[in-house]
Amino acid sequence: MSPTSVKNLVIIAENPRAGATSGHRLVVELTEMLEALDYRVRILTSVEEIQTSIQEAQLREELACIVSAGGDGTLRMIGPWADPETPIAIIPLGTENLMARYLGFTVDVATTAKWITKGNRRKLDAGLANGQFFLVMASVGFDADVVTRVHEARTGHIRHWSYALPLLTSIRDYRYPELRIRSSNHRRSLRAKWAFVFNVPMYAMGLPIVPDADDSDGRLDLCSMRNGSLLRAFVYLAGILMGRHRYWNDVHSERAE
């Protein structure tokens, strides 16, 4: 995708707080490579400016690509602002970088520059949870409680050990309320204590909760677990690691709209 007289702008949406350390050096390197290929590049860090610049550039039909320089949260933020035909590339600067790993993006920005210029594209489904856009997955229950505590306590870069105290707090305080789940496959609500909804088969630490989720079938993959306790959490974890959990009577899996 060599730059034309119109579509020659690349917007890099950089999250300065993503991951354990700053990845600004990689952003600068990619910028220099693209400018050498006659692209115009804008590096933006303000949420409001990122949104406005993306929308205005699309209206002017000059936007060649958006680069998400951050973690999965950065990608989730810019996704709703991109038209379906606007390509998005990733510089993985976050803690887990699930979507980048799934699509094969790495910190090798020379390869990323080649992908941007060659124009290789892949269309993906997206989901909505409480009105919020997501590409990877959404969860309800203990997992979501931990993540909420992490983000409420966040003051800067997130490292893996940033989850330690929120995890311990959730272990102490979480009471596993009953969840009611409705899907297009059932007239009655399912009842569970844990619920995971996947668009792509990725989860933290590579846990294969739904290893066959399809990113382009127009549906989402549900995995729910009926029992809630710390002991049962370890049992479910063992089952997931062995790939046996979906055969258990208290675990429900389905693909639904």
Language model: regions and residue ranges:
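ATP/NTP phosphate-donor binding region
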Residues: 1-66, 76, 187
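Catalytic core of DAGKc-family lipid kinases
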Residues: 11, 36-37, 44-45, 84-87, ...
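Glycine-rich beta-strand-to-loop/alpha-helix junction loops that act as flexible
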Residues: 16, 69-71, 91-93
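ATP/nucleoside-binding phosphotransfer catalytic cores, i.e., glycine-rich phosphate-binding loops
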Residues: 23, 183-184, 189, 214, ...
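Short conserved active-site loop signatures built around small residues
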Residues: 72, 195
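Short Gly/Thr/Asp-enriched flexible loops that form oxyanion-binding sites at enzyme active sites
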Residues: 74-86
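Glycine-rich phosphate/pyrophosphate-binding beta-alpha loops
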Residues: 139, 143, 196-209
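Gly/Ser/Thr-rich active-site loops/lids in small-molecule metabolic enzymes
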Residues: 154-162, 203-232
